[in-house]
Amino acid sequence: DKADKYAGQLQKRIDAVKKKNKSSDKDLKKALIMCAYNDETFGTYKSALQESMLNQLGYTNVATGTSDLTLENLVSMEPELIIYVTSDRNKAMDKEATDKMEKNAVLENVPAVKNKKIMTISYDELMDYGPSVIDSLEKVNDFVNK
């Protein structure tokens, strides 16, 4: 009974996000889940959980799920949204990552950079399974719709 009530509350939160982001699977916008950006190379994450979350927001992840990608890769991916994932492992790099992206002339025409659609979120927030996924969904939704 308690579990059903909690599940219902979580579903209401998901439905509220879906209502704000009506789009069909045909017109999904490009998002990139990125990590470890150092102004020359970067890594990406790609998993079914995060893809599903992005789909609820009208996006698809253009990431390849690999590392050592170049700025040219980033330009050709043309993301409209970049979700930069911070972690303890990359703490020093993460501090300046989004600033470096925004100031890099090579990236000035990347839609997410041009339109200031780069957000940061911690690895634990975005990658953990369970109810925290809905917290992440809401956080990304708030950023996308601000």
What name fits each language-model region?
Residues 30-35, 62-63, 82-85, 118-121:
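Structural recognition of the beta-strand scaffold that forms the well-ordered cores
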Residues 55-69:
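Interaction modules related to DNA damage response and DNA replication/repair
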Residues 71-84:
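Proline-aspartate-enriched helix->loop->beta-strand connector
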Residues 2-57:
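Basic- and aromatic-lined ligand-binding clefts that recognize polyanionic substrates
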Residues 23-27, 75-77, 111-114:
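Extracellular/periplasmic catalytic domains that process cell-envelope and extracellular macromolecules
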Residues 19, 68-73, 101-107:
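Alpha-helical scaffolding within the catalytic cores
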Residues 4, 8, 44-48, 68-69, ...:
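Soluble non-cytosolic domains of exported or imported proteins
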Residues 85-146:
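Structured C-terminal subdomain patch of bacterial secreted/periplasmic proteins
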